[in-house]
Amino acid sequence: MFFGKIAIYPYVRQTDISKSMQLSSEWYMAKCVKSTVEGRLTDKRYQKCVASLFCCVLLSFINSALAFNEAQPSHTQQAAPQASFATIPLIYIKVAGTSPPGTPDYLKSPSNEGTAGASVAIKDANITGKFLGYQFELTEVSVPTISELQASLAKARQHSGSSAKANHIEITSNQQSNIAPVVLLDMRSSDEVEAASIEQLITTIQSTLPNAVFFNVTNSDDLLRQNSCRLPLFHTIPSYQMKADALAQWFRTKRIDEIFAVYGKTADDAAYLAAFKRSAKKFKLSLVETKQWQDSFDLRRAAFAEIPQFTRTTETYQAVFTADSAAQFAYSLPFNTYYPVPVVGAAGLKALGWHFTHEQWGARQLQSRFNDAFNRHMNEVDFAAYLAVTAVANAAQQGSDLKQQGILNTLLSDDYTLGAYKGRPLSIRPYTHQFRQLIALAHEDALVTHAPLEGFLHQTNELDTLGAPHTTCKDKL
């Protein structure tokens, strides 16, 4: 571009005409002032310079005015209608119960355990849901026992066919839109009576919410997975068999063969011990002795003095396995056994679905967001609830409709996988509805490794070296 004999090089992008004109104007103004002061311009060249400057300023004003007019909304333009979202009801049912009197306060579960993980997942899912047309809404139901919840639901169903109330929280059927409610079950039990109660509870809820999809986020009982395999129930918490197999793989890797087992009096403790016995048989470990913890010990008064005597056996052992779901004794065993050996299970080296020191594969940002939101670490129950919500949201993102059968078909399809900060895609075992996943082997302050460990292979999926039963639905373990 030339003005007179002075060339201006097009160093400004053509898309920014206003800026280009402004820079050209400033450059010419400076040039004209300099030329006038030095007296080097003739009158004719001065007039050309002034004319060029005027043209640049005029073009700049015109472009600014056009841009301003385009930015202003038209008075006749109608406001865009707001998008309508399909609401996915998320009901978190928690059977709180009471902690035994001997459980230390620092080992008790947080009051918002599970619901905190679900809340983080809902926040993430609703961001994507704004573009796909769905939103999760969380409702919490807390009762002391399963039987009380069943009674509340049955009584409310007699008075109203469309809704039920439990603990003053309404559970409403969503049959008008056929959107499947997502029910997260937070209840621990491991004997046949309680497992049957959970199945009956699901049946009771189905009478109110016939199209619901259920997720078990706390119960690790293998019996529940076998007996409820025909229900629309998925298990995001690892089973006891998965945890026991992970510990057994670690024992084989460390060449530890002789194990002494100590277990508590709860049904969960018996279930964990039974799973470890199956793992010991599968991986050819030897259980030298098995003892049940005695409540007569007063750890606060005796200051752990009786622990070495209790852990004394007729045969030597190389490790101690503990099953203590109520946190009554296992915390007192590390570095206090008769033989100086590692403790695993409920204390020492634990097999967990999630540990707060896990930071690989993007897990660090999830840990940070959870810690910022709730000022505590994320545990395996929180992650199981997070995983349940994420699985449903992921199914919706893959194009599944929000009806029960659509979600079930997506989750149980052969090619379904889910990324969940564990380094390997998660999938679901069709015969037990258990989520395949890595198991974290960790102690109180650090992550040791993830199972399955190197060298343990499977013909189809290495994650099936952890807890995959060689049985079919309804077969006995």
Segments predicted by a language model, with ranges:
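Hydrophobic alpha-helical elements and their junctions with loops/disorder across both membrane
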Residues: 14, 37, 58-59, 163, ...
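Small/flexible residues
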Residues: 7, 15, 42, 47-50, ...
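Disulfide-bonded cysteine motifs in exported proteins
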Residues: 27, 44, 50-51, 224, ...
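N-terminal cationic leader/targeting segments used for protein routing and processing
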Residues: 6, 20, 32-35, 45, ...
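Extracytosolic ligand-binding ectodomains
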Residues: 2, 66-477
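Bacterial N-terminal signal peptides
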Residues: 52-61
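Intrinsic-disorder-associated interaction segments
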Residues: 22, 51, 456-459
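N-terminal secretory signal peptides that target proteins for export/translocation
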Residues: 1-46
